[in-house]
Amino acid sequence: MASLATLVLDLDGTIVDSLPDLTAALNRLMTARGLAGFPAPSVAAMVGDGTTKLVERAFAARSGQARHGDIDAFVADYTAHATEATRAYPGVEDTLGRLKASGWQFAICTNKTVAATHAVLDALGLADWFAALGCGDTFPVRKPNPAHLLGTLDAAGGDPRRAVMVGDHANDIAVARGAGMPSIFAAWGYGAPSMAEGASAVAERFAALATLGPKLLT
Protein backbone atom coordinates (compact mmCIF):
# COMPACT_ATOMS: atom_id res chain seq x y z
CA MET A 1 0.00 0.00 0.00
CA ALA A 2 1.35 3.43 -0.91
CA SER A 3 2.42 5.64 1.99
CA LEU A 4 0.38 8.68 2.89
CA ALA A 5 1.46 11.99 1.44
CA THR A 6 3.26 13.93 4.18
CA LEU A 7 3.28 17.64 4.85
CA VAL A 8 6.30 18.43 7.03
CA LEU A 9 6.07 21.81 8.72
CA ASP A 10 8.34 24.12 10.62
CA LEU A 11 6.79 25.33 13.90
CA ASP A 12 7.69 28.92 14.81
CA GLY A 13 6.52 31.37 12.17
CA THR A 14 4.77 28.58 10.26
CA ILE A 15 2.22 26.84 12.49
CA VAL A 16 2.37 29.21 15.46
CA ASP A 17 3.22 32.83 16.11
CA SER A 18 5.56 32.38 19.06
CA LEU A 19 7.37 35.69 18.64
CA PRO A 20 5.75 37.43 21.65
CA ASP A 21 6.89 34.72 24.07
CA LEU A 22 10.34 34.40 22.49
CA THR A 23 10.81 38.17 22.69
CA ALA A 24 9.66 38.34 26.31
CA ALA A 25 11.98 35.53 27.42
CA LEU A 26 14.96 36.96 25.55
CA ASN A 27 14.38 40.40 27.01
CA ARG A 28 14.14 38.98 30.53
CA LEU A 29 17.58 37.44 30.00
CA MET A 30 18.98 40.68 28.59
CA THR A 31 17.62 42.65 31.54
CA ALA A 32 19.10 40.16 34.01
CA ARG A 33 22.48 40.68 32.37
CA GLY A 34 22.18 44.47 32.41
CA LEU A 35 21.67 44.77 28.66
CA ALA A 36 19.00 46.46 26.58
CA GLY A 37 16.24 44.29 25.18
CA PHE A 38 14.93 44.02 21.64
CA PRO A 39 11.71 44.86 19.81
CA ALA A 40 9.88 41.89 18.33
CA PRO A 41 10.98 42.54 14.70
CA SER A 42 14.63 42.37 15.76
CA VAL A 43 14.05 39.05 17.52
CA ALA A 44 12.24 37.73 14.44
CA ALA A 45 15.37 38.37 12.40
CA MET A 46 17.43 36.29 14.83
CA VAL A 47 15.25 33.15 15.02
CA GLY A 48 15.40 30.08 12.81
CA ASP A 49 18.68 28.44 13.81
CA GLY A 50 17.78 27.20 17.27
CA THR A 51 18.09 28.51 20.80
CA THR A 52 21.87 28.69 21.00
CA LYS A 53 22.14 30.88 17.92
CA LEU A 54 19.30 33.13 19.09
CA VAL A 55 21.00 33.84 22.41
CA GLU A 56 24.44 34.24 20.81
CA ARG A 57 23.07 36.68 18.24
CA ALA A 58 21.32 38.69 20.92
CA PHE A 59 24.48 39.12 22.97
CA ALA A 60 26.55 39.86 19.86
CA ALA A 61 24.08 42.59 18.91
CA ARG A 62 24.79 44.19 22.30
CA SER A 63 28.56 43.83 21.83
CA GLY A 64 28.67 41.07 24.38
CA GLN A 65 29.14 37.33 24.63
CA ALA A 66 26.79 34.79 26.18
CA ARG A 67 28.16 33.48 29.46
CA HIS A 68 28.13 29.90 30.64
CA GLY A 69 24.58 29.11 31.67
CA ASP A 70 22.88 31.87 29.67
CA ILE A 71 21.51 29.49 27.05
CA ASP A 72 20.22 27.04 29.67
CA ALA A 73 18.68 29.94 31.58
CA PHE A 74 16.89 31.15 28.46
CA VAL A 75 15.61 27.67 27.59
CA ALA A 76 14.27 27.10 31.10
CA ASP A 77 12.58 30.49 31.28
CA TYR A 78 11.16 30.35 27.77
CA THR A 79 9.82 26.80 28.17
CA ALA A 80 8.06 27.84 31.39
CA HIS A 81 6.36 30.73 29.60
CA ALA A 82 6.18 29.38 26.04
CA THR A 83 2.41 29.51 25.76
CA GLU A 84 1.47 32.79 27.42
CA ALA A 85 0.96 34.71 24.17
CA THR A 86 1.74 32.11 21.48
CA ARG A 87 -1.15 31.35 19.14
CA ALA A 88 -1.73 29.18 16.08
CA TYR A 89 -2.01 31.08 12.82
CA PRO A 90 -5.50 31.45 11.34
CA GLY A 91 -6.74 28.41 9.45
CA VAL A 92 -4.28 25.85 10.82
CA GLU A 93 -6.71 23.19 12.02
CA ASP A 94 -9.21 23.72 9.19
CA THR A 95 -6.44 23.33 6.62
CA LEU A 96 -4.93 20.26 8.26
CA GLY A 97 -8.39 18.75 8.42
CA ARG A 98 -8.96 19.28 4.71
CA LEU A 99 -5.63 17.71 3.83
CA LYS A 100 -6.13 14.78 6.20
CA ALA A 101 -9.48 14.04 4.58
CA SER A 102 -7.73 13.78 1.22
CA GLY A 103 -5.04 11.36 2.43
CA TRP A 104 -2.31 13.48 4.00
CA GLN A 105 -0.46 13.13 7.29
CA PHE A 106 1.69 15.70 9.08
CA ALA A 107 5.04 16.02 10.84
CA ILE A 108 7.02 18.85 12.38
CA CYS A 109 10.68 19.57 11.62
CA THR A 110 11.86 22.40 13.88
CA ASN A 111 15.07 23.61 15.47
CA LYS A 112 13.07 24.28 18.66
CA THR A 113 13.75 21.95 21.61
CA VAL A 114 11.57 18.90 22.28
CA ALA A 115 10.40 20.33 25.62
CA ALA A 116 9.35 23.69 24.19
CA THR A 117 7.73 22.07 21.15
CA HIS A 118 5.62 19.79 23.32
CA ALA A 119 4.69 22.68 25.61
CA VAL A 120 3.38 24.74 22.70
CA LEU A 121 1.55 21.93 20.89
CA ASP A 122 -0.05 20.59 24.06
CA ALA A 123 -1.20 24.01 25.23
CA LEU A 124 -2.77 24.80 21.85
CA GLY A 125 -4.34 21.36 21.46
CA LEU A 126 -2.39 20.62 18.27
CA ALA A 127 -0.24 17.64 19.28
CA ASP A 128 -2.55 14.94 17.95
CA TRP A 129 -2.29 16.22 14.38
CA PHE A 130 1.33 15.15 13.98
CA ALA A 131 2.67 11.68 13.25
CA ALA A 132 6.22 12.68 14.23
CA LEU A 133 8.16 15.56 15.78
CA GLY A 134 11.73 16.16 14.65
CA CYS A 135 13.05 18.81 17.04
CA GLY A 136 16.34 20.61 17.44
CA ASP A 137 17.54 18.07 19.99
CA THR A 138 15.93 14.95 18.48
CA PHE A 139 18.81 14.11 16.12
CA PRO A 140 22.57 14.79 16.14
CA VAL A 141 21.99 17.33 13.34
CA ARG A 142 19.53 20.15 12.70
CA LYS A 143 18.17 22.08 9.74
CA PRO A 144 19.50 22.86 7.19
CA ASN A 145 21.16 19.42 7.35
CA PRO A 146 18.84 17.18 5.28
CA ALA A 147 19.26 14.32 7.76
CA HIS A 148 17.02 16.27 10.14
CA LEU A 149 14.17 16.34 7.63
CA LEU A 150 14.73 12.80 6.40
CA GLY A 151 14.86 11.48 9.96
CA THR A 152 11.62 13.26 10.78
CA LEU A 153 9.95 11.87 7.69
CA ASP A 154 11.18 8.36 8.47
CA ALA A 155 9.77 8.63 12.00
CA ALA A 156 6.40 9.49 10.46
CA GLY A 157 6.60 6.53 8.09
CA GLY A 158 6.62 8.89 5.12
CA ASP A 159 8.25 8.72 1.71
CA PRO A 160 10.45 11.62 0.47
CA ARG A 161 8.90 11.14 -2.96
CA ARG A 162 5.49 11.93 -1.48
CA ALA A 163 6.36 14.73 0.91
CA VAL A 164 6.47 18.53 0.95
CA MET A 165 8.34 20.79 3.39
CA VAL A 166 6.79 24.07 4.59
CA GLY A 167 8.60 26.83 6.46
CA ASP A 168 9.32 30.54 6.77
CA HIS A 169 13.13 30.43 6.86
CA ALA A 170 15.92 29.84 4.35
CA ASN A 171 16.83 26.74 6.39
CA ASP A 172 13.47 25.19 5.52
CA ILE A 173 13.99 25.71 1.82
CA ALA A 174 17.58 24.46 2.02
CA VAL A 175 16.73 21.34 4.02
CA ALA A 176 14.04 20.40 1.50
CA ARG A 177 16.44 20.91 -1.38
CA GLY A 178 19.05 18.73 0.31
CA ALA A 179 16.48 16.00 0.91
CA GLY A 180 15.26 16.13 -2.69
CA MET A 181 11.80 17.36 -1.70
CA PRO A 182 9.64 20.27 -2.90
CA SER A 183 9.16 23.17 -0.51
CA ILE A 184 6.65 25.92 0.22
CA PHE A 185 7.80 29.21 1.70
CA ALA A 186 5.46 30.46 4.43
CA ALA A 187 5.25 34.15 3.61
CA TRP A 188 3.10 34.86 6.67
CA GLY A 189 6.01 33.99 8.98
CA TYR A 190 9.15 35.75 10.17
CA GLY A 191 11.51 35.23 7.26
CA ALA A 192 12.43 38.01 4.86
CA PRO A 193 10.92 37.63 1.37
CA SER A 194 14.40 36.92 0.00
CA MET A 195 14.42 33.66 1.96
CA ALA A 196 11.83 32.28 -0.47
CA GLU A 197 14.54 31.92 -3.12
CA GLY A 198 14.64 28.34 -4.32
CA ALA A 199 11.24 27.39 -2.92
CA SER A 200 8.92 25.36 -5.14
CA ALA A 201 6.01 27.65 -4.21
CA VAL A 202 5.14 30.57 -1.94
CA ALA A 203 2.02 30.62 0.26
CA GLU A 204 0.67 33.90 1.57
CA ARG A 205 -1.54 32.25 4.19
CA PHE A 206 -1.79 28.87 5.86
CA ALA A 207 -5.02 27.94 4.11
CA ALA A 208 -3.22 28.01 0.76
CA LEU A 209 -1.38 24.82 1.73
CA ALA A 210 -4.55 22.82 1.09
CA THR A 211 -4.14 23.41 -2.64
CA LEU A 212 -0.39 24.05 -3.01
CA GLY A 213 0.67 20.83 -1.27
CA PRO A 214 -1.25 18.48 -3.57
CA LYS A 215 -0.19 20.46 -6.66
CA LEU A 216 3.47 19.88 -5.88
CA LEU A 217 3.00 16.11 -5.84
CA THR A 218 1.11 15.85 -9.13
What spans do the regions from the language model cover?
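Well-ordered alpha-helical segments embedded in enzymatic catalytic cores
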Residues: 91, 95, 148-151
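Conserved SAM-binding loop
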Residues: 8, 15, 88, 106-109, ...
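Substrate-recognition element of Asp-dependent hydrolases with the DxDx(T/V) motif
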Residues: 26, 92-122
